[in-house]
Each structure stands twice: as structure tokens, then as C-alpha cells.
Regions:
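Conserved MFS/SLC helix-loop-helix module at the cytosolic interface between two early adjacent transmembrane helices
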Residues: 64-103
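Helix-to-loop junctions at the C-terminal end of transmembrane segments
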Residues: 66-77, 262-274, 358
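Paired small-residue
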Residues: 92-95, 103-111, 300-308
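Helix-loop-helix hairpin linking two adjacent transmembrane segments in secondary transporters
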Residues: 104, 133-135, 142-189, 232, ...
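C-terminal transmembrane helical hairpin of 12-TM major facilitator-type secondary transporters
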Residues: 276-320
């Protein structure tokens, strides 16, 4: 009997690991343009701020597609659906690696965005479902760890490959790694019938939960502020701080490493006082952005800011996702789809705001504007915390 239990635990952990790897590759490809922005812009003879709008387009496709695509796929067995999504993901990366102009690259990114739309709508609930008993919160933390490792390994390695070969090779390698993950998924995941996915009728029910709606708005606000700055952090470090390309790569690595710390802190502290934990994470993100330009030439201070920023944004993202699942246990996939859509509205809006700031004020101002948006989000958090104190 003990062997059976140990075997169950082993396979359950391996399945969680597969989802963590999947999160790693999806987050790597979503944000790797941030690390390659200057190279892509140079190859197409475009400005970084213009190429950065590719991040906006990707995010808005995800935000618009998450809920309708999730509803269309609500009754599809989840393992089959995941394998289809990875096939689309891989084919789109092949096109990215072959992109002969910016528009072909943009089209390939839209294919990836469609896969992303459904993947993040169903993954949080699935990883909790396949996790060992009494390890549900830790499983969500491991999923977030995969996302953090994308920042630690995915983005710096993507940048290194782009520097040694070219940015197209980075997308080709991502497609190759995704193929290996797809094979692991096919081998390890069990049959996963759709459960508690919700339907179109779930949407108005969720809309009547004011705290849930308040959290979705909070997500849009705080992520808009974050990506106003983060979308252009690579050119900021190179051009404003005037640090070397190697230091820039190392700073991206530190940002991702900080995400692991954020995941660990979530697992240890979130359950003790979720409201204070969310507020503290937001303050870390806001202060890091507001002070970015002030200490732009002090290398060790910028490293510290990047680290605290990474800790804050990872802690915040997992916490808000957990809160959404807690408030909508009857329609987890629909709630997650709206969360993913809201998050990507924030990404797209932030990248757009950052582009406008660069054109109107200059690259050096992105931290001030991003931090100001974060302050508005902090006031909104305070408002909903007081209004729904007992929820």
C-alpha cells in the first residue's frame, strides 16, 4: 500500500513538473522579444519603440481571445487540447525563425498568442488537479517557478543565442524545446476530462462578484504600470544607464532569479496574510520603477532594484491568480481566462504606454510613468480592501 502511495506521489509530481516546463516555455517566448528588441529593430531597420508594439499586439490578441477560445474549447479533453496547442506553438515558432520581414514575424507571433490564450486559461486549474494531495498551493508555486525560470534562463539564454547567432535562431531553439515538452506531456499526462470549466452562462454570474471584478481591474492597472517600464528595460539599460550588453544580460538573469524568491515567499507567506502580502509586493514593484532613473548610473543599485522588482512582480502575479481561483471555484477556467485576458490587457497597454512615453518624453521617463500607474493601482487595492474587508 505504501508503494502505491509513493508511486502516486511520484507521478503526480512529474505531471506538475511538466506543467512547470510548459509555463517556462510559454513565458520565455512571450517575453523574449524584450531581450531581443534592439536586435530585431536593427535587422528590420526600425525603431525599438515601434518594434515594441509587437508586444502590445501579442498581448491584445491574448486578452481578446482568452475567454471566447476557452469557451469554444470548454468540452475538449484537456490532454488532447494541450497537445494541439503545443503543435500550433511549434509551427508558429518555425515561421518566426524563417521570418523575412516584420509582418511575417508579427503573424507568427499571433499564432503563438492564440495558443497562449487557451493555455493560460486552463493551466492553473489543471496543475492543482494533477498535484499530490495537500500540495495544491505548492503546485501553483511550482507553476510560477516555471514562469520565473523563463526570466532566469529563458530570456538571458535567448539573448545570448541572439547575440552569438541571431534573433531568429532564438525562436528556432524555443520551438525545439517545446517539441521535447510536448513529448513529455504526451507520455506523462493522464486522460483529463474537462471539469468545472464553466460556460458562457458563468460569465454574468462571475460579473456579479464585485471583489472578483475589482481584482481583475487591479490586475489591468498594476500590470500596465509594470510593462510600461519592463517592455523597454533592455534599451533603457543599454542607452540610459549605458551598461554593457553583458551586464544587461546579467540584469535580466537577476530579474528572473528574483522570481524564484518571489515564488518561495508566496508559498511561505501568502496564506498567513494575503492582503498584506499583495500590498507589500506592489510596493516593491512601484518603488523599483520610480527610482530606476534616479540611480540609473549606479550599477549595484540598479541590480538591487531589478532584484526587488522581480521578487515583487512574481509574488504579486501568483497571489492575484490564487485569489481569483479562491473567489471562483465553480468556474475556474472561465475565471482564469478572464484573469489571463486582464493580465494581457495590462501587458499590451503597458507596452503601448511605454512606446508613447518614449516618443513624447524620452526613454528615461518610462520608470516614472510606470511607477505612477502602479501608485494608482495601489490606491485601488486599498479601496477594495476596505470595501470588501470580510470577503
Amino acid at each position: 500500500m505504501m508503494i502505491t502511495k509513493q508511486s502516486y506521489q511520484k507521478f503526480a509530481l512529474m505531471r506538475v513538473f511538466v506543467f512547470s516546463l510548459s509555463a517556462f516555455i510559454f513565458n520565455t517566448t512571450e517575453f523574449v522579444p524584450v531581450a531581443l528588441l534592439s536586435d530585431i529593430a536593427e535587422s528590420f531597420e526600425m525603431e525599438s519603440a515601434t518594434v515594441g508594439l509587437m508586444i502590445t499586439a501579442y498581448a491584445w490578441v491574448v486578452s481578446l481571445g482568452s475567454l471566447p477560445l476557452m469557451l469554444l474549447s470548454a468540452k475538449i479533453e484537456r490532454k488532447r487540447l494541450l497537445l494541439f496547442l503545443f503543435a500550433l506553438f511549434i509551427l508558429s515558432h518555425i515561421l518566426s525563425a524563417l521570418a523575412w520581414n516584420f509582418w511575417v514575424l508579427l503573424i507568427s507571433r499571433m499564432g503563438i498568442a492564440f495558443a497562449h490564450s487557451i493555455f493560460w486559461s486552463i493551466t492553473a486549474s489543471l496543475v492543482i488537479r494533477v498535484a499530490p494531495r495537500n500540495k495544491k498551493q505548492q503546485a501553483l508555486g511550482l507553476l510560477a517557478l516555471g514562469s520565473s525560470l523563463a526570466m532566469i534562463l529563458g530570456l538571458p539564454l535567448g539573448r545570448i543565442i541572439g547575440q552569438i547567432l541571431d534573433w531568429r535562431s532564438t525562436f528556432g531553439v524555443i520551438g525545439g524545446v517545446a517539441t521535447l515538452i510536448m513529448l513529455l506531456m504526451w507520455k506523462l499526462l493522464p486522460y483529463l476530462p474537462s471539469r468545472n470549466a464553466g460556460t458562457l452562462a458563468s460569465v454574468p454570474i462571475l460579473m456579479k462578484r464585485p471583489l472578483l471584478m475589482g481584482i481583475y481591474l487591479l490586475v489591468i492597472m498594476v500590470i500596465s504600470g509594470h510593462f510600461t517600464t519592463y517592455s523597454y528595460i533592455e534599451p533603457f539599460i543599454l542607452q540610459i544607464s549605458q551598461f554593457s550588453p553583458d551586464i544587461t544580460t546579467l540584469m535580466l538573469f537577476v530579474f528572473g532569479l528574483a522570481g524564484v524568491v518571489g515564488s518561495f515567499l508566496f508559498g511561505r507567506l501568502y496564506a498567513k496574510n494575503s492582503r498584506k502580502f499583495i500590498a507589500f509586493a506592489m510596493i516593491l514593484v512601484i518603488c523599483s520603477q520610480l527610482l530606476l532613473f534616479v540611480f540609473k548610473n549606479l550599477e549595484w543599485v540598479v541590480f538591487l532594484q531589478i532584484f526587488l522588482w522581480g521578487v515583487g512582480i512574481t509574488s504579486l502575479t501568483i497571489s492575484l491568480q490564487m485569489r481569483v481561483l479562491q473567489l471562483a471555484p465553480d468556474a475556474t477556467d472561465v475565471a482564469s481566462a478572464i484573469f489571463s485576458g486582464s493580465y494581457n490587457v495590462g501587458i499590451g497597454s503597458g507596452a503601448l504606454f511605454g512606446s508613447i512615453v518614449i516618443h513624447q518624453l524620452g526613454l528615461g521617463y518610462i520608470g516614472f510613468v510606470g511607477g505612477a500607474l502602479g501608485l494608482l493601482a495601489l490606491f485601488w487595492l486599498r479601496f477594495i480592501t476596505i470595501k470588501f474587508k470580510k470577503t
